[in-house]
Amino acid sequence: MGVFGYLRERTPCHLTLLDPVDVGPEEVPEVLESLVKAGTDAVMVGGSTAHASQVEAVVEAIREVADVPVILFPNGPEGLAPNADAVLFMSLLNSRNTYYLIEAQVKGAPLVERFGLESIPTGYLIVGEWGTTVSVVGDARVIPFDRVEVIVAYALAAKHLGMKAVYLEAGSGAPEPVPPEVVRRVSGIGVFTIVGGGIRSPETARELAEAGADAIVTGTAVERDPDLAAEIVEAIKDL
């Protein structure tokens, strides 16, 4: 079936995002314990400044405590590791920098092939009205939440370029999550919709899932309060 098929079968699903810069291998068991019990569907590993050695070590630690797929969330070729199951092979569609549109992908593709990773082609969109780390590092022309038609147009571009998923990213630690109406409009075009950033409560996660999000990503909430993150997982699973 593959990892992407597994995720599609479990929608709405929950993805735990671990940034190896913030969560080291020795911290993985404690962070993941409550999330695995709550039913998180997969673990994503990566971040804006993570490097291969850090990623590989965290993936190995996850393998020891969780029997769920491990999906790479790379910041570039340096975010790839051979011991994961799959990779979100992303293009940052609203970046001003061609490196994040295609150059990083050209450098990373041979590694994906060599490592035998399942590739999930993904249109990555940074949305909102504030400067998060990912928007700064990715040199993104951030799309405000109220420009719904523009966001949908980007998502349609991803769909017609053959991408399997669209990732709506408000950014790690964002003050607000992606609004349900934006999620509703994007999921309505018939593309697998991943939503992350600013999700701090079970109620918010439930609203986004009800709006059509296929996958809900929590990262900072996981690192700060694993038990709260577990409640978010349970809220999604109760639908």
UniProtKB/Swiss-Prot annotation:
Record InterPro entries: GGGP/HepGP_synthase_I, GGGP/HepGP_synthase_sf, GGGP_HepGP_synthase, GGGP_synth
Catalytic activity: sn-glycerol 1-phosphate + (2E,6E,10E)-geranylgeranyl diphosphate = sn-3-O-(geranylgeranyl)glycerol 1-phosphate + diphosphate
Main localization (coarse): cytoplasm
Pfam families assigned to the protein according to its UniProt record, in alphabetical order: PcrB (PF01884)
Family (UniProt): Belongs to the GGGP/HepGP synthase family. Group II subfamily.
Protein task: Prenyltransferase that catalyzes the transfer of the geranylgeranyl moiety of geranylgeranyl diphosphate (GGPP) to the C3 hydroxyl of sn-glycerol-1-phosphate (G1P). This reaction is the first ether-bond-formation step in the biosynthesis of archaeal membrane lipids.
Protein name stated in the entry: Geranylgeranylglyceryl phosphate synthase
Species for this entry: Methanopyrus kandleri (strain AV19 / DSM 6324 / JCM 9639 / NBRC 100938)
